[in-house]
Regions:
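Radical SAM enzyme core and accessory elements
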Residues: 1-43, 456-567
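N-terminal pre-triad scaffold of radical SAM enzymes
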Residues: 5-18, 205-239, 252, 256-260, ...
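Conserved SAM/AdoMet-binding glycine-rich loop
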Residues: 13, 257-396, 402-404
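A solvent-exposed, charged loop/short amphipathic helix patch at secondary-structure junctions
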Residues: 27-57, 109-136, 364-375, 454-466
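Short, charged N-terminal beta->alpha structural module
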Residues: 48-77
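Flexible glycine/acidic-rich beta-alpha junction loops that bind and position SAM and/or redox cofactors
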Residues: 102, 110-114, 267-281, 316, ...
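Catalytic cores of alpha/beta
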Residues: 162-170, 324-325, 405-421
Length: 567
């Protein structure tokens, strides 16, 4: 137990309550905090989720992984008693006259991330998201106003505060963007010494030897296994980061740190599990992934292993790699009938990005998305890959985006066609609006507003949620029908007009009323399940084994490269 100065700790690190919570051990429960605070019932947003989990000395037991990375950097230079990471409810305990700087991290402080913008626009209820409200509570904390320490804001959402014009209003002195290993320590040293500071600091690509393991536990037992991506998607920021696989001893050290603090789960932070020790041309390394999962799973105290993201192309390219790791992951899955009564069987889950069904959009903005397959095979690879995951006990989630720059109605219809092809598969679709993120290549593009959505784009949202209800919650259809009809006639009719009528009728399960004449007719037969279609399987197999085409990549591999040929 550390003895902290009652007159204030020199450096205090914290985050909003919604980002500190572990949501009963379910990482995907955190999505609740992106919705408008006014529409989240208190029975769902349980008060106990936001209560502090403290160590005996008052420091936080579990905090976001990025904050632990900053703590590890600061511990290189500052004494242990000079740095504390605390729950925001405890700021008045640690911020005092001797406090020099308060560091805050936030993923979505102004509600400008993909999910929050999309669904706050559709729900159309004014006010902050839960994350936004909790962030404001941090920066308006009485202790910060009373003692006026320097405030440094980092995290993936730091850009949002500048974008919203709230930097001065929220009393923020420095914004830190990007990877911090080469910049953060210097900023805090200058802040403590009272030296002049820049208003904004941008991190640079970090060599692997500069990545320090965390020294205290992260929420959900997060450990970083890879960093960066390299596929070159222009709407995404991680693709601009140098791709690394962290060494197994480094990973195991972080696992042990989490378990020692009382976590019973480990969460693999990665842009794609299949990047772990992959080949130079993205070849998945099944044996290396199996060794990783076995090593982590064998650490005493590890009951569960969670995954963040995967890519679908490696699944279709090397199904045997999926077969190799799936039994190991199934042994450590939290998603079982004992965790949720509506789960009929255990399953593994992770998030991958479909993004669009339009080959034109994919070629323009995400040409390397399914490399080594040619982008023309995009539908087949996504459907086949999803089927392979299902066959190995996975029930993944997949994001799909509409509102791309220069998206046409035909592009949107192509996404609708891909949704139709996925029928018969277990996947949870997350339909979103395009958002120009600050550190992505498309940052200067304009995002579409809810008022500008075309009928096809409204139908895109309706089809995705109709798909989800059919796959995941058929028994709740009467509830969805009542809620859809009630919300339309009492609210959405006045908020969005008649353009919301057909989509809501589709969710209400009135397909004849909810269909889209001409473009996407109601009652069209579901596509043949390509998982069992020999022609589609042969198409993918031929691509893997024989095709060799140039693909222009963005990011670290900017030269043209060729599709892999299986020998």
């Amino acid at each position: 137990m550390v003895r902290y100065d009652p007159q204030g700790v020199k450096i205090v690190l914290t985050a909003p309550r919604g980002e500190m919570s572990r949501y009963n051990g379910d990482p995907f429960g955190a999505f609740i905090a992106v919705f408008p605070e006014k529409v989240i019932p208190r029975v769902i947003l349980r008060p106990e989720w936001f209560k502090p989990e403290d160590n005996p000395d008052g420091s936080a037991r579990f905090v976001p992984y990025g904050l632990r990375k900053v703590e590890a950097l600061l511990r290189r230079h500052f004494a242990e008693e000079d740095v504390v990471v605390c729950h925001p409810d405890n700021l008045e305990r640690f911020v005092g006259p001797k406090t020099k700087v308060v560091g805050i991290t936030s993923m979505d402080p102004m509600g400008l991330a993909y999910v929050s913008v999309t669904y706050s626009s559709i729900i159309a209820v004014p006010g902050d998201s839960v994350d936004g409200l909790e962030f404001r509570r941090v920066v308006e904390n009485p202790a910060l106003r009373k003692y006026d320490p320097l405030v440094i804001l980092g995290g993936a959402g730091a850009w949002q505060v500048r974008h919203a014009g709230k930097v001065e209003a929220y009393g923020i002195d420095v914004l830190v963007h990007g990877e911090g290993e080469l910049t953060v320590l210097d900023v805090f040293k200058k802040a403590v010494a009272g030296e002049p500071l820049p208003k904004e600091v941008h991190g640079s690509k970090v060599p692997i030897e500069f990545i320090s393991p965390i020294v205290n536990a992260a929420s959900y037992g997060v450990v970083e296994i890879t960093r960066g991506c390299g596929r070159g998607c222009q709407f995404c920021s991680p693709t601009n980061r140098r791709r690394h696989s962290l060494p197994l001893p480094h990973i195991l050290k972080e696992v042990e740190t989490n378990i020692r603090a009382g976590s019973d789960s480990i969460f693999f932070a990665t842009e794609d599990l299949f990047l772990y020790e992959c080949g130079p041309k993205f070849e998945p390394n099944g044996p290396a992934m199996a060794r990783l999962i076995e090593a982590v799973g064998s650490v005493p105290g590890v009951k569960f292993i969670h995954l963040s993201h995967i890519a679908i192309a490696p699944v279709a390219y090397d199904p045997k790699a999926v077969e190799m790791i799936s039994p190991l992951l199934m042994e450590k899955t939290r998603y079982t009938p004992s965790f949720r009564s509506n789960y009929t069987e255990p399953f593994v889950t992770a998030l991958f990005g479909i993004e669009s069904g339009s080959i034109r959009i994919m070629k323009k903005y995400m040409r390397g998305k399914i490399w080594p397959f040619p982008i023309e095979q995009y539908h087949e690879v996504n459907v086949q890959g999803t089927g392979i995951l299902n066959d190995n006990g996975w029930k993944p989630m997949a994001t799909m985006i509409t509102g791309w720059p220069d998206e046409t109605p035909d592009d949107t219809v192509k996404s609708l066609e891909l949704i139709d092809k996925l029928k018969g598969h277990d996947v949870f679709l997350v339909p979103l609006l395009f958002i120009p993120l600050e550190d992505a290549k498309l940052k200067n593009e304009r995002r579409v507003s809810i008022e500008q959505l075309t009928p096809e784009q409204w139908d895109f949202f309706a089809e995705a949620w109709r798909f989800n209800i059919d796959v995941w919650a058929q028994e709740l259809q009467p509830l969805f029908t009542f809620a859809s009809l009630f919300s339309y006639f009492t609210y959405f009719r006045w908020k969005h007009g008649r353009k919301a009528f057909r989509p809501i009728m589709k969710i209400a399960n009135f397909p004849v009323i909810g269909g889209m004449p001409e473009k996407f007719p109601p009652g069209a037969p579901a596509s043949v399940n390509p998982r069992y279609c020999a022609e589609d399987e042969a198409m993918v197999a031929r691509t893997v084994e024989t095709m060799s085409i140039p693909v222009e990549m963005e990011g670290p591999q900017e030269r043209p490269i060729e599709v892999l040929q299986r020998r």
